[in-house]
């Protein structure tokens, strides 16, 4: 297959995210290396038969790598299933789309970097929100239960506890809304 027009920018965007890009292809080594050099791809694994792709993914995982596989065909389905994150191109086959963890709606390679950015940001926000909730509960519940009443005279009245719980929920929702900043700017 010929490289898509946005492929060099997509590889650069993945590099900016700290991702090592590997081309896993059935093409011959010389052709694959030529295309990889044009696109800035880090590693090439060429001459791989369709049934061997998932074994190559498993070998990368055995080396301690977290692997995201992008594919669109029937031949890619086992590798998409083997990968830590399977990413199907939306214009791909039904089996690839069914097997993947993420389905890109367009056939634009730049969307891979966008999906990874949104995924990483979502995990970061989940951890932050969990931290807010645990922190709030670790402080507010003992106070509301009157644990500090004998020693410090500190206790929350029920209506103040309910109000502060609402405030905690508002902080969590506002923090989650910051995910919108991760979307790429329209061009």
Regions found by a protein language model. Give the residues of each.
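Membrane-embedded transport module
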Residues: 100, 105-187
């Amino acid at each position: 297959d010929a490289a898509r027009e946005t492929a060099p920018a997509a590889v650069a965007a993945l590099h900016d995210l700290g991702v090592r890009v590997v081309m896993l292809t059935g093409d011959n080594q010389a052709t694959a290396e030529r295309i990889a050099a044009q696109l800035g791809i880090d590693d090439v694994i060429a001459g791989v038969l369709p049934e061997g792709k998932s074994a190559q993914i498993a070998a990368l995982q055995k080396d301690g790598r977290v692997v995201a596989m992008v594919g669109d065909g029937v031949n890619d389905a086992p590798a998409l299933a083997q990968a830590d994150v399977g990413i199907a191109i939306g214009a791909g086959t039904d089996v690839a789309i069914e097997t993947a963890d993420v389905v890109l709606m367009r056939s634009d390679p730049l969307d891979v970097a966008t999906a990874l950015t949104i995924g990483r940001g979502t995990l970061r926000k989940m951890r932050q929100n969990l931290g807010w909730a645990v922190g709030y509960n670790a402080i507010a519940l003992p106070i509301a239960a009157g644990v500090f009443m004998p020693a410090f005279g500190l206790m929350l009245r029920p209506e103040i506890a309910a109000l502060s719980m609402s405030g905690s929920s508002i902080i969590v929702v506002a923090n989650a809304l910051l995910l919108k900043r991760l979307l790429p700017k329209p061009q």
